[in-house]
Amino acid sequence: MTFEEMIERSEHIVFFGGAGVSTASGIPDFRSAEGIGGERAEEVLSHDFFVNRTEEFFDFYRKNLLFPDAVPNAAHYALAKLEKRGKLKAVITQNVDGLHRKAGSNVVYELHGNVNYNYCMNCGKRHGAEYVAGSNGVPR
């Protein structure tokens, strides 16, 4: 049975993906030689680092996680098409880029959040990626 036949016969597909999906959109992954930092990224993006070194956290966030010009690629659109056909029930992603939603997928579980939805722990307001990108130091 071919992959296409498996998809056609399936009724409850769930896609679980990560950085490999968005690299074709120009977004580097975390762990490859061309990626954005491996263990360093995991340290900087931890809650402890955020609490104790907030300004450095946001500098890293702005430089390494925001890709305002990135657009969905063929994989993102193919998954959205499968959802519209009723084949794909959900996308579960480790990516934070929001490209699955931009491509038209509606049932998306973003395990590590989405850079387009930022929540201020002090005032409770929500901010888009543009707000963080346009700020210096810690967004206020």
Predicted features and spans:
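Conserved catalytic core of sirtuin-type NAD+-dependent deacylases
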Residues: 1-140
